[in-house]
Design a protein with these regions (language model features):
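Basic amphipathic alpha-helical segments that dock to polyanions
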Residues: 194-195
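Short, cationic-aromatic polyanion-contact patches
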Residues: 159, 173, 208-226
């Protein structure tokens, strides 16, 4: 069985994947292993087959901000493969896992050979630009309290069996949330205490429950309207 067929990005295409797969490398990684670092000159694309990684960017002053996590089925490194510029992010493993490492020439060859894959890449890049634009807007106009609300909503999913509630699993560490929204851990801790006292969030075993997500949504919407 052709292993590239395990990668969602290449499913249901008319490509003969075997020849491309011969030019890729498959390797396992360990927890806390750095897969890609800032300013690396490599241009390979990494397709996550198993495991989870975290993506960080760094300001000129050295401050690091978490862009997010990636899991099996997702990939990173496409920008360097496209423009050949040094890596702009650090990608570190959160768990053990496996990646398919595809050289940039192979990636570009596939993109130009398959209209289906080409469109998938365009849609993915458009989605990422929209997400970054939304986060830029939040960092520009919202205070840390409302940035925290927005991030919690973004990280959450519907809580099964509890209508109207949302849940973040596993519960996020305060220092991780701080790195996501650009503030200090102590500030996140204070806001969590306030949200808990208001009955808006609840910490359970293995999860953070957002009891009334509509309240957080309304607060964010009102804060954004005030900036217009």
């Amino acid at each position: 069985m052709v292993q590239l067929a395990r990668v969602p990005f290449f499913k249901d295409t008319d490509l003969e994947l075997a020849s491309f797969e011969q030019r890729c490398n498959w390797r396992r990684f360990d927890t806390d292993e750095i897969l890609v670092d800032f300013e690396d000159v490599s241009s390979d694309v990494y397709f996550i087959v198993a495991g989870e990684v975290r993506v960080l960017v760094r300001s000129q002053a050295g401050k690091e901000v978490i862009l997010g996590e990636m899991r099996a089925g997702q990939f990173f490194g496409e920008l360097a493969a496209i423009d050949g510029i040094k890596r702009s992010a650090n990608v570190t493993a959160l768990t053990r896992g496996e990646v398919c490492i595809m050289p940039a020439p192979v990636f570009r060859e596939i993109i130009f050979a398959s209209p289906v894959v080409n469109e998938r890449l365009l849609r993915l890049l458009a989605t990422r630009v929209r997400e970054l634009n939304a986060r830029l807007m939040e960092h520009t106009v919202l205070d840390l309290r409302h940035r925290l609300y927005s991030e919690l909503l973004r990280l959450s999913t519907t809580r099964a069996g509890h209508e109207g509630e949302r849940v973040v699993t596993p519960p996020p560490y305060h220092h991780v949330l701080a790195a996501r929204i650009g503030c200090r851990r102590e500030q996140v801790t204070r806001e969590f205490s306030t949200l808990t006292a208001e009955g808006l969030i609840e910490r359970t075993r293995g999860a953070l429950v957002i009891k009334r997500p509509e309240v957080l949504e309304t607060r964010v919407e009102e804060a954004l309207r005030e900036e217009k």
